[in-house]
Amino acid sequence: MRARGVTSRMLSRLKRLVSRPVGCAAVAMALLASGCGGGGPLESEQVFSDNVFSGNHLKPKDYPIHGIDVSKFQGDIDWNAVANSGVKFARIKATEGGDQDARFQANWEGAKAAGIPHGAYHFVYWCRPPLEEIQIFEQNAPVEDDALPPVLDAEATPTSPTCRHHVTQDEAIADTQVMLQEMERHYRKRPIIYTTVDFYEANLSNGALTDYPIWVRSTKHHPAVKYGSRAWHFWQYQSDGRVPGIGGSVDKDAFYGTKEQWDAFLREPGVRPVETGAGGPAPAPTASQTAAAQPQESIAEPAGAPAE
């Protein structure tokens, strides 16, 4: 990656940030994302397209730690190429209802061999007893001390060919709680809830399950626009990303904080500290963090894909 200095364009952007009520930390994050300090470790120039993200909030590129989430639909993945591209973590689909993802074992072993921090997720099937679902997940996703916390993918499934059951808010919260508690008991780590805008608004916006970190989907707006003041750990900002080593599209995600906070999360994953706010600017990075971190590529949401 070529070294970059502070251009007039960067200075103009920083002046605009300073004039907005986002605080000094946002300016620091903007400097971080601009690559001040001589560039970062990525082998190729990474380009973001922010035209789909509106408002004065931070853009995906303003966060230094980026990752992907994958399933069988990504096919055969060259995990060494993924690692060399700068991807910092991978979420790997293990199960959906009572079925194992066909590529889970290969993806798990590949990410591990490539040195990419990785964790498994379960996609909820609302027509099966919740405890039974998680027991199937536990039979497939191994317990490993260095794995990322497990994720429960809780979203509405109105188009499912086999499960059209519309869960009530009480059912959704109760079943989700059962699954999260069993995950935590088995893996000895606080699990993470993945949620979409519609599921969150219908079931979690009233303050339910705030003891658990959340991973939010929002491909058009910053999470603060759609999820309010709820602090988030991970933001799925794109569903048609491109990453070396993966032949087609892939979901791309950002971690909420600095490299230092990411390293702390890897050591002790858990509920995000309240003082960091709702997905807003993280504390200002150090000079070494600024020099070391560069984000991933981003392109616009594809035509016909749901934008939230």
Where do the model's predicted regions map?
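Functionally critical loop-and-helix segments that line ligand-binding/catalytic clefts
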Residues: 40-70, 209-308
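Substrate-binding cleft of extracellular glycoside hydrolase catalytic domains
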Residues: 60-76, 92-180, 184-186
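Short loop/helix-cap segments at secondary-structure boundaries that form the rim of catalytic
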Residues: 77-84, 202-209, 223-231
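Hydrophobic anchor at the start of a short beta-strand
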Residues: 118, 189-191, 214
